[in-house]
């Protein structure tokens, strides 16, 4: 046995894990791996020995976003002058599991795999001898990554019989000329040629010479610990007890070692867990929260909660289609504020508000996007609601594209007073509709919802309507026109009316001017409105999704429903009643004489645009005449007259005095 001073020692390998590695791991964990904690193939990178410089004083394995591969590396290869090292990662689901797993048993299992591969191999295949393992846990809420890298190494002890710091110049030149084209790390030197085929010790009486292309330029003259597995192979499989190893370095600091085997344990022993910077055995922690841009962290956090839905409860959920929606909110009051917050929760990043009002002192307690300062800002007038709501959304989530527009929506029953101004505001509204995919109607009055209803049908937008009573609420979606769906076209907010909307805002008392409603109703209606939108988007027919749910209704509509939303039902109307804490669903077909969505109204709007709108606003009877409601009213009056005549109390005999008393 040699003394400790002559025992061959090594420079340990260190890992360098770039932040992009963890960013990619986080994405894969959320979107691909999910709850799968099985081993996944990865690869690492080392600078080619011929490309080392003075800063490469320790052997380093680098991991980055390119480390994630679909399958195991098939052969020794290089990329951008870097050796590609084969490895794997086991990413556990909980920190408790990460702490509890037996690291020694895990290392032993890796050592067993390495031993079997080495003993079955007849060449120094780099990817086998220099594999690595990563055990990790990803805390995606805090962006902390716990990891421990292992370089499984089979043990054998060697004594240094001779060290020579001067290599024969001819041999040095031979090695220099070949390393530029080699992808491996360990070779047998035969007549100046580097060979991966290794002779057994029984086939030669000479002390063989091997070349180890070192992965560091350590001044301590200690070779990289990557040499260990090659030495174990030579001792265990090839039977060598005495060898020469040229530790090649490209800085003319190569040296030759003559080694004698001290011990090759049987059974084999394995080591390999990386030590911390303090020299202790233990995992490392990468806290990306300290390195990342807070805005980017917020964006990732929003995606986190949503993508977790796909792990177990809703694996088929299409999050991209929700995130891509451009949403227009008409009304930035109580409903508008809550709808906007719910949309943010679903990852919607393009939201526009339209409202002509300003924040008053009664608003902040019921409308969560406003605060006390908004009430007296802008020279005491209060902030415009639309812009204040948009700014508040950006403070909540900087990644949202939120904009506010302070315009009035032209209202049926309210004649034009300033054509230039109102025409300009209509033009802005028209542009906003064209730029949007979804429109929420969240205004205070019925007549304010008429024009957006017409525009939504004419432009084929998804329109969601939410309205409040004192202790009730209504949430509904408007039907769209399609040649394939005409028979089942759903109605709109005005399809139950037999008169066109009128001015309901003039001559009202204070309790009629303010929205008097139980505060919780707005939250319920807003959340239902957003969830209804999500269900529609998850349906293959989108806005044409069928609202029929039971078999009787299906037969009634003569259609067998086979398509469903991934989130279940897509009802037409949801009516809630807080006095009984009940909720009912209804579906109502389009009314052919509807003042907002009938075909005649839609056609006139498409043809004439603003001119049509002006006619409807200035001429109270024009709209009813156009859609046929006037005729319906006339027919109703005629039918009522006929009914009265049929119920006449006049008979052939004289009228009873009791009858006269009742009539009078």
Curated annotation (Swiss-Prot):
Motif (GXGXXG motif) on chain: 331-336
GO molecular function, one term: Atg8 activating enzyme activity
Keywords of the record: Autophagy, Cytoplasm, Protein transport, Transport, Ubl conjugation pathway
GO cellular component: cytosol; extrinsic component of phagophore assembly site membrane
GO BP of this protein: autophagosome assembly; autophagy of mitochondrion; cellular response to nitrogen starvation; cytoplasm to vacuole targeting by the Cvt pathway; piecemeal microautophagy of the nucleus; protein modification by small protein conjugation
Signal peptide residue numbers: none
Active site: 514
InterPro entries, per the entry: Atg7, Atg7_N, Atg7_N_1, Atg7_N_2, ThiF/MoeB/HesA, ThiF_NAD_FAD-bd, Ubiquitin-activating_enz
Compartment annotation: Cytoplasm; Preautophagosomal structure
Domain of life where this protein originates: Eukaryota
Oligomer status and interactors: Homodimer.
PANTHER family listed in its UniProt record: UBIQUITIN-ACTIVATING ENZYME E1, UBIQUITIN-LIKE MODIFIER-ACTIVATING ENZYME ATG7
Domain remark from Swiss-Prot or TrEMBL: The GxGxxG motif is important for the function, possibly through binding with ATP.
Family under the similarity heading: Belongs to the ATG7 family.
Protein purpose: E1-like activating enzyme involved in the 2 ubiquitin-like systems required for cytoplasm to vacuole transport (Cvt) and autophagy. Activates ATG12 for its conjugation with ATG5 and ATG8 for its conjugation with phosphatidylethanolamine. Both systems are needed for the ATG8 association to Cvt vesicles and autophagosomes membranes. Autophagy is essential for maintenance of amino acid levels and protein synthesis under nitrogen starvation.
Protein name per the record: Ubiquitin-like modifier-activating enzyme ATG7
Organism per entry: Lodderomyces elongisporus (strain ATCC 11503 / CBS 2605 / JCM 1781 / NBRC 1676 / NRRL YB-4239) (Yeast)
Gene name in the database record: ATG7
